[in-house]
Amino acid sequence: MAAGEVKSVLFVCLGNICRSPIAEAVFRKLVTDEKVENKWRIDSAATSTYEIGNPPDYRGQTCMKKHGITMNHIARQVTKDDFQTFDYILCMDESNLRDLKRKSNQVKDCKAKIELLGAYDPQKQLIIEDPYYGNEKDFETVYEQCVRCCKAFLEKPH
């Protein structure tokens, strides 16, 4: 990455209240710890409209607090602008990927590279499963996957 150049990443899941806000918060902490937060624009969004305006799921917030990470995101839906302004759009599962690819085809000048966040997992867990209908342990699994994937993503040359 050239000196002074700001890169951008948008984390996406179905509702933007479980997986993507966890990934966003984890990545924010990583770039802050590495003292490169001024080199990144970071956000998260949903493919659906189900949860727009809502805070992250309380179980995800509890999990993140346990790890000393605060979340202050409010759910929003992916916009056409996102495809033109973010360098990377990283999503959680095949359904997100399909929805994003379909939406990106309707956008002129899509500059975003759309990928699964799990593609960066050193443990090769490609899919980050939705913990919404699960329990605290499922949120912890999402957190652990996001830490592994976000670290690997941050370490790659951009």
From Swiss-Prot:
EC category name: hydrolase
Active site residues of this protein: C13 (nucleophile), R19, D130 (proton donor)
Modified residues (N-acetylalanine): A2
Pfam families hit by this protein: LMWPc
Keywords recorded for this protein, A-Z: Acetylation, Cytoplasm, Hydrolase, Phosphoprotein, Protein phosphatase
Primary site of residence: cytoplasm
InterPro entries: LMW_PTPase, Ptyr_pPase, Ptyr_pPase_sf, Tyr_Pase_low_mol_wt_mml, Tyr_phospatase_low_mol_wt
Keyword Acetylation in record: yes
Gene3D superfamilies: 3.40.50.2300
Modification Phosphotyrosine, positions: Y132, Y133
Catalytic activity field: O-phospho-L-tyrosyl-[protein] + H2O = L-tyrosyl-[protein] + phosphate; a phosphate monoester + H2O = an alcohol + phosphate
Localisation per UniProt entry: Cytoplasm
CDD domains listed in its UniProt record: LMWPTP
Superkingdom per UniProt: Eukaryota
GO CC, one annotated term: sarcolemma
The protein's Enzyme Commission number: 3.1.3.48, 3.1.3.2
GO molecular function, one term: protein tyrosine phosphatase activity
Similarity section: Belongs to the low molecular weight phosphotyrosine protein phosphatase family.
Role description: Acts on tyrosine phosphorylated proteins, low-MW aryl phosphates and natural and synthetic acyl phosphates.
Protein name, UniProt field: Low molecular weight phosphotyrosine protein phosphatase
Organism: Gallus gallus (Chicken)
Lineage: Eukaryota, Metazoa, Chordata, Craniata, Vertebrata
